[in-house]
Amino acid sequence: MGDPKKPRKKWMGPKHPWIKERLVRELELVGRYGLRNKRELWKLETLARYFRHRARSLLALPPEVREKEEKALLARLNELGVLPENATLDDVLNLTAEHFLERRLQTIVYKKGLARTIYEARQLIVHGHIAIAGRKIRSPGYLVKKDEEDLVDYAPTSPYAKRRLEEQVQQEEAAS
């Protein structure tokens, strides 16, 4: 049978460790998006780099060959919600890690108002208070697809969901 394959790391760190502009930019992104460490940022930079590389390789192909793969690449990025439907390969070449940081579950929970801070959003997710379509997701780095975005809410078993339901009932009683 053989041994299972060794899991490879899914990120590539910076080529030079002490470039001040990069360090300042990374620190600002870590703070703004509530990341635990820079490795979380580097994973998304690697993902953006992968899609940019695919776009460059597609641009090198003849037009009749690249058409099918170009549609698949753009459809994937549209499904993730990173690019709009009418995007082109030039838009893919402009992708950055920030495009993917905006699609993280942690960021979406904060922007939907389910948490007061980005750090509270991370804690709610890790503690199992957030679900997508009723399914608990405990990974703050989960990339939320465009069609899942409306389904992000408190988990049905969470005390936060029960508290919000009680508040809604009280508001309805007060209104009537």
From Swiss-Prot:
GO molecular function annotation: rRNA binding; structural constituent of ribosome
A Pfam entry, by short name: S4
Entry's Gene Ontology BP terms: ribosomal small subunit biogenesis; translation
S4 RNA-binding domain location: 103-165
Family matches, as SUPFAM superfamilies: Alpha-L RNA-binding motif
Record GO cellular component, one term: small ribosomal subunit
Keyword list, A-Z: Ribonucleoprotein, Ribosomal protein, RNA-binding, rRNA-binding
SMART domains: Ribosomal_S4 (SM01390), S4 (SM00363)
Family: Belongs to the universal ribosomal protein uS4 family.
Subunit structure: Part of the 30S ribosomal subunit. Contacts protein S5. The interaction surface between S4 and S5 is involved in control of translational fidelity.
Described function: One of the primary rRNA binding proteins, it binds directly to 16S rRNA where it nucleates assembly of the body of the 30S subunit.
Descriptive protein name: Small ribosomal subunit protein uS4
Native organism: Hyperthermus butylicus (strain DSM 5456 / JCM 9403 / PLM1-5)
